[in-house]
Design a protein with these regions (language model features):
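Short beta-strand-to-turn element immediately C-terminal to the catalytic PLP-Schiff-base lysine
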Residues: 128, 136-137, 150-156, 195
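Phosphate-binding glycine-rich loop
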Residues: 1-34, 48-51, 58-60, 125
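Conserved SAM-binding loop
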Residues: 14, 37, 58, 152, ...
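Conserved active-site segment immediately N-terminal to the catalytic lysine
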Residues: 112-146, 161, 173-178
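Conserved residues at the C-terminal ends of beta-strands
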Residues: 15, 38, 87, 137, ...
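PLP-dependent aminotransferase class I/II
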Residues: 1-2, 6-10, 71, 75, ...
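Structural detector of well-ordered beta-strand residues that form the stable sheet scaffold
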Residues: 13, 36, 57, 110-111, ...
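PLP-dependent aminotransferase-like
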Residues: 27-114, 121
Length: 320
């Protein structure tokens, strides 16, 4: 209840993790056939589609926002298409208005993988309020976490009822079953961790913004690119991605940082269009960006002195 109030959403179910959230969302909407999705996301976005016996259809991303390109969605729609599953990459809102318009025109469902989107608002609304269902991850790597966990969010009470049944073995009461379900519940221990962390969310969001701004100040004189954040957005600064000129430069930067026990992540590499179970779906922009992007260390206790050191090492690698 406290989480729902904090996010200002209609209905929320606490689940065991973000991947189960995606799988339950697909099941609750009774999706079949093809699901249009992004090649630039964590592997769970695509693997959940395949796990639920649907076919992922990759639509390439926008070079600047790193989100699925809504202008390319319509041309990927076929008679077998049932939904769009888009990711708010690094918590940056997709073009939700354009995606909604395409979905309504063609009678498609919309799921947003909002694993990174906790705390982001778009046009004054929680980013989790968009789509038929939004899914969250509360893994320990996220800015708000329950050690391990996830959630599904919807404004439709019937969809909520279906997802509640599916996360609890199919139970509709102690002795009645409404269908097939799994054990997607979470525990009181994880919920307690979430309640503890929830008190500090605003402080964490504020600190992460400060740290991201400081990173950017230190790196703007380098030949690097930063993700473009959508307009009318209060961004959560869940990650600090940096795009280098080439993979060669990226690897040189990572080598130097690793030598100093600093370990940035290659989010997201490889492009999901290159997965062995996704064939013949070239996504050139995603594939190019995925080879050149890393996320630098970011957590609310990170100091400016540590950022100074990280940036000095990056500058040394890029320039020499």
């Amino acid at each position: 209840m406290k989480l729902k109030e904090k996010l200002d959403v209609d209905h929320l179910l606490f689940l065991s993790n973000g991947t189960i959230a995606l799988q339950i969302a697909i099941r609750a909407l009774e999706l079949k056939g093809e699901i249009i999705t992004t090649p630039f996301s964590y592997v769970a976005t695509t693997s959940s589609i395949v796990w639920e016996n649907c076919t992922p259809i990759m639509v390439d991303i926008c070079q600047d926002t790193l989100n699925i390109d809504p202008a390319k969605i319509e041309q990927a729609i076929t008679p077998r298409t049932t939904a769009i599953l888009a990711t708010h990459v690094f918590g940056n809102p997709c073009d939700v208005e354009a995606i909604d318009a395409v979905a309504k025109k063609h009678g498609l469902k919309v799921i947003y993988d909002a694993a990174h989107a906790f705390g982001t608002t778009h046009k004054g609304r929680s980013l989790l309020a968009y789509g038929d269902i939004a899914t969250c991850s509360f893994h320990a790597t996220k800015l708000f976490h329950t050690i391990e966990g996830g959630a599904v969010v919807t404004s439709d009470p019937e969809i909520l009822k279906s997802m509640a049944m599916k996360r609890n073995f199919g139970h509709t009461s102690l002795t009645d079953f409404g269908g097939v379900g799994v054990n997607g519940k979470n525990s009181e221990v994880h919920a307690a961790m979430g309640l503890t962390n929830l008190k500090y969310v605003e402080e964490i969001l504020e600190k992460r913004k400060e740290l991201c701004d400081y990173y950017k100040e230190n790196l703007t004189d380098l030949p690097v690119e930063f993700q473009k954040i959508a307009a009318d957005t209060q961004y959560n600064h869940s990650y600090f991605p940096v795009i280098f000129e080439s993979e060669k430069v990226l690897l040189a930067v990572m080598e130097v940082l690793n030598l100093h026990n600093i370990y940035p992540r290659r989010y997201f590499y490889p492009s999901l269009s290159e997965l062995p179970y996704v064939e013949g779906q070239s996504s050139p922009i995603s594939e190019d960006v995925s080879r050149r992007i890393i996320c630098l260390p970011l957590y609310h206790t990170l100091s400016r002195e540590e950022i100074d050191m990280i940036c000095r090492l990056i500058k040394r690698s890029v320039r020499y």
